[in-house]
Amino acid sequence: VSIDSFDVLVSTHQAYIDAGADVITVNSYASSRLVLDPAGLSSEVRSINMKNIDAARLARERCGDDAVLIAGSISHALSFASEQEKSTATCIEAFDEMVSFFEEGEVDLILLEMMSIPTRMLPLFRSVSSSTLPVWCGLSAQRAAPTALITGYHDETIPLIDNIQDA
């Protein structure tokens, strides 16, 4: 979106601010190298993410409300085209890169979205813990049955609390 429809992205952020949002989220949930490389966009990872940040910053500037915070979004999602799990080292490299974009773009905080897969959560937690930016973490969980343990989305055998305690 940031490449082809930058103005639409800015307008969307502005609409959220006009509606009273205290925090706007950079359109970066699915723009890490883990998602963009398989889509053939490896040479554009930096450009896409910096434009995403610029769109949020421009919207805040146009609205004239410096109290609105900008959250840089990171997920541990892989490309839908990806058929195999990525190595921990590959994940850390991609997550560190996203953190560096957010620091360079001067976002106000990092938002971890839909955390549910322990093998990718831990490397992401490691990457964001090296940043001076505050971190907001959203967990994704489910129950297989009404009386079952709350578990991570992808592994019903591991209680969610165990994932959090490991992190």
Where are these regions (language model features)?
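Domain-level signal for soluble alpha/beta catalytic cores
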Residues: 1-167
